A protein has these predicted regions:
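Gly/Gly-Pro- and Ser/Thr-rich, intrinsically disordered tail segments characteristic of DNA damage-repair
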Residues: 1-119, 127
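Catalytic cores of large soluble enzymes that bind and process phosphate-bearing ligands
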Residues: 2, 6, 140, 201
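Basic, nucleic-acid-binding surfaces and adjacent catalytic neighborhoods in DNA/RNA-processing proteins
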Residues: 22-44, 58, 151-219
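Phosphate/anion-contacting hairpin/loop surfaces
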Residues: 74-185
Length: 219
């Protein structure tokens, strides 16, 4: 599943490979997947995206997002895997969405387990998307000790540290993949109750959230 470091790196890879390319065609699923969700009928993505040029890409929370001219965006999450395909490469037989560009290259999106691929113009009213894009990222200066302690104070004292970090999208993009490293580096058992943490342990935990996510993003 996509976590924050991967979301950011996927966006970086897409900027490097498809920025400046114009969509010539959009193909709906060649192999329908009952756990791949769209916010429009897949056949409508052709009209929504064809003719638009990729201007950038962003990663936030549990989402990566392609940005096009005209304010059009294509976001995906969870088990959705984008694959860049060069002009000379054979297109995969199975995909959930395929964008073809005017230079003959393409991006194929496939889904492992489950995920969503949504096209919108900044008005995507999805709870997980809104939390991902609007929450303060652990990789920013705004995510300081004070903000982290506010999050800690907002949960029930009996909640485990593991549940605090990885549930309810309190820190979108922080999931099980990052969690174990954070707790190991902080020296805190995942079943410890939030109420049992000393101020020193809270500071160490905050620092490791930022450090581990930054390190994973840069790898």
């Amino acid at each position: 599943m996509i976590e924050l470091p991967e979301a950011i790196n996927l966006a970086k890879q897409m900027r490097e490979t498809v920025r400046g390319k114009t969509v010539s065609a959009v193909y709906p699923p060649s192999s329908p997947h009952k756990f791949c969700w769209f916010n429009h009928e897949p056949e409508e993505y052709q009209a929504l995206l064809a003719g638009h040029t990729v201007t950038g890409a962003a990663g936030f929370g549990i989402f990566s997002e392609l940005e096009f001219d005209g304010g059009v965006r294509l976001c995906f999450n969870d088990g959705v895997n984008p694959r860049f395909i060069r002009k000379e490469e054979v297109r995969p037989k199975k995909y959930q969405l395929l964008l073809e560009f005017t230079d003959g290259s393409a991006i194929a999106f496939t889904v492992a387990m489950y995920g969503s691929i949504s096209c919108h113009s900044g008005d995507y009213d999805n709870e997980y998307y809104r939390k991902s894009i609007e929450s303060i990222s652990p990789l920013t200066e705004e995510f300081d000790e004070g903000y982290f302690k506010e999050l800690l104070a907002s949960v029930k004292p009996a909640m485990s540290v593991k549940a605090f970090l990885a549930t309810e999208q309190r820190m979108p993009g922080l999931g099980n993949g990052c969690l174990q490293d954070i707790l190991f580096q902080a020296g805190i058992h995942p079943k410890r109750k939030v109420s049992s943490l000393s101020d020193c342990e809270k500071n160490v935990l905050w620092a490791q959230v930022k450090t581990v996510l930054q390190t994973m993003t840069e790898q």
